Amino acid sequence: MKTINPIKDLSIFINHNIRVMTTPYFNDYTPENENNNIALRIGQIESINVEDLLERPTIDINTENVRNFLYNQVVMITGAAGSIGCEIVRQVANYHPRVIVLLEIAESPLHDILIDLKKEFPEQHFAHIIADVRDAQMVEEAFEEYEPDVVFHAAAYKHVPLMEEFPRQAVLTNILGSKNVADMAVKYRTKRFVMISTDKAVNPTNVMGASKRVAEIYVQSLYLKLAKDNPTCTKFVTTRFGNVLGSNGSVVPYFKKQIAAGGPVTVTHPDIIRFFMTIPEASSLVLEAAALSNGGEIFCFDMGHPVKIADLAKNMIRLAGYEPGKDIEIIYTGLRPGEKLYEELLNQKELTIPTKNEKILVAKVREYDYDSVSTQIQALIDEAQNGKAFPCVQRMKKIVPEYKSKNSIYEQLDK
């Protein structure tokens, strides 16, 4: 059976100025009368949007597994007001945990999401904490008060060019922050710790990706050390996926703003490609991967077809009713610091093992000795707290030897 790539197939119509609309599934049509005759209402016909172009068929997850995993548990989500964090909160709420603890440093987004959550889930108990994952005492106070059974660690810096400018901040949030939360999960006997990672951790070319790879190494090596002596210890699992549509700072809302302003639309390179997922899709796979975990895995997801960003820009311009290059110009600005033309979900040396969900794979990665690597990581953290950028990046490169900088001032460290 032919596999359909929506962005390519629908582009055929868009390129010929044929307006494409969407309708609900047949089962969602509106009953017209008491005989249950159904009709399609005008209001149910909607213009297509870019998410429709990129979206793949609905992903099925084993909701029974996830329910057994989360029901009546105390669940903590760090970075709970972020794009991924708040969607994880919403999806977790559907499985009726005893308490959902939202840990967040940004007070305004936290306030806003709490208002929405109380309307959407009036029966669910939500607790909230304003705290910085970089502050070990704050993190411990949160664990001491709530003793979470499950932790989803979504708090992170993720902006590639900015982290090239401020590598010490990437280390302190993405590495020290992850270490603080992981260490407290062990101390307070959390059952499962789920770290949200990124495809940029694979063969990293930038500070952000390298910092996430170091965090992956820390939590995995910690688990391997603990599990040797105690098979019932906290289970650590990492989930790794690509770009998320509509997340803060992602390309789609950025292009929308540029198109609304009349252009130009800026693309870094005509050949740059990326994998995309919708936020709900990514979050649902995180939940199922967490439920599947036996401890120590790095899960990667089937991200579907990669999308050429230039094609995405052109289609978004056409969807807005304009002609690319005529009504709205596309300008190629050059790759940004730390950016590469394509992302990888796996290192070429990493093999995969299938799981019960065909969309979720286990990456077989190099294992690190905890005692050795934790010493190196602590030295890296000390450098970030007290030192300067270049020595900090140099230490990351020693921990992650495949980290080779691109379009970056740190390329000189690779010579």
Please report, for each region that a protein language model flagged, where it lies by residue.
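Strand-loop microenvironment adjacent to phosphate/nucleotide-handling motifs in alpha/beta enzyme folds
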Residues: 65-67, 221-415
